[in-house]
């Protein structure tokens, strides 16, 4: 059957168009009102569950961070401590931008960065840490915790040693530069079979240790004993010396065996070269300070360190426990405290 379609009514078309237009305008206004309301809402920190230890890694609640103070060795200690304590307590860890700027050019660190603009809006609970692990640190309350202090002790993170070593893996170009230098070294015309990194901390410690902490820095006698310790145990070796007092080292380290090279540049503001050289060696001689401690920790092998370098009544021993700083398998050589006793 043929159906004849009537032409669309002109008034009806206008009516439908009017309804469509009004409906569209109303819908758009409602959407804009919702968007504006979202913009006007204050940024809030979400209310988080206190049972985060039972959650998976992707569900960790809260935010923990740590102060970024001191130079390279200090900030490595702060990073590793934050890494370990956050994992122990089931909280996500974030590092300050300043710490990232110090560590990221050298190491393949993985913790996310907390920028200062964000950090300033968080109601932090400051939590001071001693320089050694305490039982109470296994159960730290609070979702937004900022650690303070200078923690640098294997007692915090040694149970995660492989993970810490992974975090402090050198970038390829940093490692290769150090290895290229070491490959070019010779002892009496032949390539050495054993490399011993030597770090001599001087700088401000030369004055701070005796005047503030009733202590000493490494002297000529200690370094001679440390070098001889390795010479008695290894053949075909070379000592790779780095220091922030290289002129003193050149005058006080015996080079008559032909097995000592003064390699580091001693520039504290850019320590990557010296640190990389030390960690690419097989063994370590350190004096005092976190730079040497971390070099020895990452290197492995045998480590000789300066022991008993303060008087028994030193205030330094209230904030520093030698047994928490030096691994049990490391070998200490006692410092000569006689210069302190003369005053």
UniProtKB/Swiss-Prot annotation:
GO BP: carbohydrate metabolic process; fucosylation; glycolipid metabolic process; glycosphingolipid biosynthetic process; L-fucose catabolic process; oligosaccharide biosynthetic process; protein glycosylation; regulation of cell adhesion
Record keywords, A-Z: Blood group antigen, Glycoprotein, Glycosyltransferase, Golgi apparatus, Lipid metabolism, Membrane, Signal-anchor, Transferase, Transmembrane, Transmembrane helix
Pathway: Protein modification; protein glycosylation
GO cellular component annotations of the record: extracellular exosome; Golgi apparatus; Golgi cisterna membrane; Golgi membrane
Main location group: Golgi
Catalytic activity, EC: 2.4.1.69, 2.4.1.344
Residue positions the entry lists as glycosylated: 188, 282, 308
Disulfide bond sites: none
Residue intervals annotated with topology Cytoplasmic: 1-14
Lumenal topological domain residue ranges: 29-343
Organ and tissue specificity: Small intestine, colon and lung.
Transmembrane segments: 15-28
Keyword Protein transport part of the UniProt annotation: no
Catalytic reaction equation(s): a beta-D-galactosyl-(1->3)-N-acetyl-beta-D-glucosaminyl derivative + GDP-beta-L-fucose = an alpha-L-Fuc-(1->2)-beta-D-Gal-(1->3)-beta-D-GlcNAc derivative + GDP + H(+); a beta-D-galactosyl-(1->4)-N-acetyl-beta-D-glucosaminyl derivative + GDP-beta-L-fucose = an alpha-L-Fuc-(1->2)-beta-D-Gal-(1->4)-beta-D-GlcNAc derivative + GDP + H(+); a neolactoside nLc4Cer + GDP-beta-L-fucose = a neolactoside IV(2)-alpha-Fuc-nLc4Cer + GDP + H(+); a neolactoside nLc4Cer(d18:1(4E)) + GDP-beta-L-fucose = a neolactoside IV(2)-alpha-Fuc-nLc4Cer(d18:1(4E)) + GDP + H(+)
Superkingdom of the organism of origin: Eukaryota
Subcellular location: Golgi apparatus, Golgi stack membrane
Pfam families linked to this entry: Glyco_transf_11 (PF01531)
Membrane disposition: Single-pass type II membrane protein
InterPro entries reported for this sequence: Glyco_trans_11
Role noted for this protein: Catalyzes the transfer of L-fucose, from a guanosine diphosphate-beta-L-fucose, to the terminal galactose on both O- and N-linked glycans chains of cell surface glycoproteins and glycolipids and the resulting epitope regulates several processes such as cell-cell interaction including host-microbe interaction, cell surface expression and cell proliferation. Preferentially fucosylates gangliosides GA1 and GM1 in the antrum, cecum and colon and in the female reproductive organs.
Assigned protein family: Belongs to the glycosyltransferase 11 family.
Other facts: There are two genes (FUT1 and FUT2) which encode galactoside 2-L-fucosyltransferase. They are expressed in a tissue-specific manner with expression restricted to cells of mesodermal or endodermal origin respectively.
The protein's name in its UniProt record: Galactoside alpha-(1,2)-fucosyltransferase 2
Lineage, highest ranks first: Eukaryota, Metazoa, Chordata, Craniata, Vertebrata
